[in-house]
Amino acid sequence: MYDVLFLDRSHGEQVLASGLDHDDACRVARSESERRGVGRMFLAGSEVGERRDVVLIVESAARAA
């Protein structure tokens, strides 16, 4: 399961969706990144580097840890 987050430089982390399968998470991330005019990435066990506005897909368990 995956969560889709929006990381905003000014406001921090906002959960856009949670508990999605891979394909649904990708669809939500694609749609939200286009709507917000920001990039998107899939975080697979690493930390977010440079702090910028981005839509992020993370494993649900990784976020809870």
What is the meaning of each model-derived region?
Residues 2-8:
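A short beta-strand micro-motif
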Residues 33-65:
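Short, mixed-charge low-complexity intrinsically disordered segments
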